[in-house]
Each structure stands twice: as structure tokens, then as C-alpha cells.
Amino acid sequence: MRRCAIAICMMAALAWPAVLVAGQGRQDDVRLDAPSPLAGAREIARRTQTPTTFDRMQRYVSGSGRQLAEQTVDIAQARFDVFVPRKPPPPRGYALLVWIPPQDAYRAPMDWMPTLEAHGMIYVSPREAGNEAIVFDRRMPLALHAAHGIAARYPVDPERVFVGGFSGGSRTALRVALAYPDVFRGALLNAGSDAIGSARLTAPPADLMRLFQTTVRLAYVTGAHDLPNRRADAASQRSMQEFCVQQVHRHSMGSRGHATPDRRAFQKVLAWLDAPLPPSDHATLETCRKGLSERVRADLAQVRGLLDGGDLVAAGMALGDADQRWGGLAAPESVELARRIATGLAETR
């Protein structure tokens, strides 16, 4: 059985009586007063930054005597738009879709409500989390607070918690899903995506990456005429294949451009996203993982060779490339090499 965040599992179990008094239907400007313990600045950085970047950050903070703010969002001031199905929750609890919009507010569209009702799925979208908001300080924490806060108020099935978004919100949703596969089971990526290993999207620590490979579904939903984002989707999907991600689905929305899914498209995509997860193809997965590990080792071996040969600058450049490309899969060796290079450069000054 797929792992889930302990806090969300506990809150889901404790929240069953809350459904008797919590609101149903569409609710605007809602306050959720149960902050996520996984939304602290350090934890987000650990999961989203490259290992060498996170190590430098930690050493800087330690050396300066400062401390990272544990929470960058005041949950008491945060507001959310929510839709709760009117029918009773399924036996294991409601499904949940956390939606990250590109604008400051996005209530559940009327076109989506029949599908949300049919799936027994709650919709929640944070306010003031649009493209102008800082990703790591506000957009990601609010998505985590939304998931945790809803699970504190309603019975939620931790195996059916999803994140999604449109345009820039979709890119943020992919970051959230990649960094938190222990919270989210899938992502609805609507007209916005990035490739793992690019400057925008870092592979998380190895244990989280392995979980992401097998338990997180990615549904790419983009208009047929939205050519820039179709190209971005193609690059993102190639990277998912390279990083051994098993559950990827592409859905093109007919003659539409840069737009959110209409009722029919939303229904089709959610049917795939919310279906039972099929068994993993272990043989194919292990073959892919072996090849991936070999490529990581080869890049790190190149860095070691340059470092042992005394070419610190070239070693640093090669390590920078490997650190960005492989992220958490290259740790802890990438961190050890970075420290050696930094020490060597300091000694030559």
C-alpha cells in the first residue's frame, strides 16, 4: 500500500465526525486553521532544492546564527475556496483536489461540479497564490496547508489526494507533486509543465523519487492549439520517462488553446487520474532504475576525475551540471564533492 503523510492519515481518521457539521456545496473565502507540519521552509527546501544548494543554505544559516522561518504563511490570514460534494463521503473518505490557479482566486467551475460530485471529491484552491506569489514561500506552502486543513475538517482518503493547476499554477503543481509524493497521489497538469533536471524542477531526495516513480500519476491536459505548452509537455514527458516515472497520461483538448478543461475533458482526465493504480511493471522499472543509476554514477565519476586531476574549475562546472540534472539522486556524493571543490578553491586564493 502506498505510503501517506502520517499527519494527513491521522487527521483523516480523526475527522469523520466533522463531516456532520462542516459545510457542503461551494464555499468561498474559507479559513482552514490546521497548518501542515510539512510546509516549513526548511522541509520545502530539502525537498525542492538541489542537494548542494540545500547544503550551502544549511551551512550559511548555521554559520550566521540565523534561523529559517519555520512557516512563511500566516495560516490565520490564509483563505481558500472550497467545493464539497453534497452526497455522503465514500467509505474510505472523500477524494481531494488541491487546485493552484495562475490568478489570485479560482472557485470550482460549474462545469466541474458534476464530475467532482460523481467522484466524491472535494475541491480546494488557495487565494492569493497566483503567478505573482513566490513559489516556495507562498504557493507551495498554501497547497500543503490546503490538503492538511481539508483533511482536518472532512474525512479524506489519503490514497486519493491530488494536486493540479492551470498555466503557471500547473508548473507549481508539478513541483508540489514531485516534492511531496508522500502526500499527493497524482497531478492534473493543465497547460504548464517542466522537465525534471531543468533549472525549474529538481529531482527530490532518492527515497521520495522512488515513491514518485511508482505511486504518482501525471495527467497532462493541454489545448491542441496551445503549441508552446504542448512542446513543454513533450519535454516534461520525456524527462519522466528518463526518470522512470510509470504513470503518465497525455490528453489533448480538441480545438482549444490556452484554457482550462471543459466539462467533458475534466471528466475524462479525472476518470484516469482517480482510477485504481495498476500494479507496477517491476522488471521494466528495475531496468530503468539501473540505467538511471549508471548515468548518475558516470557523471559523478567525471567530476571526481577532474577533481583528482587538479582542475577545480572544470570539476565545479561539471558538478553544477550533474547537481541540476540529477538532484537528490546524486546525493550524498554530490555534496561531498562540492565541499571538496570549495575547500580546494579556498586554498588557492
Question: In which residue ranges do the predicted regions lie?
Answer:
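The feature captures the conserved acid-bearing segment of alpha/beta-hydrolase catalytic domains
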Residues: 193-270
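A domain-start/cap signature at the N-terminus of enzymes
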Residues: 20-94, 299, 303
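Bacterial N-terminal signal peptides
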Residues: 7-18
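Alpha/beta-hydrolase-fold serine-hydrolase catalytic core, especially in secreted/extracellular enzymes
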Residues: 25-37, 243-247, 264-349
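Short amphipathic alpha-helix adjacent to the substrate-entry channel of hydrolases
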Residues: 108-125
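Gly/Ser-rich "nucleophile elbow"/oxyanion-hole loop immediately N-terminal to the catalytic nucleophile
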Residues: 86-93, 135-167, 183
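Short beta-strand element of the alpha/beta-hydrolase
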Residues: 92-103
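Primarily recognizes the serine-hydrolase "nucleophile elbow" in alpha/beta-hydrolase
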Residues: 159-212
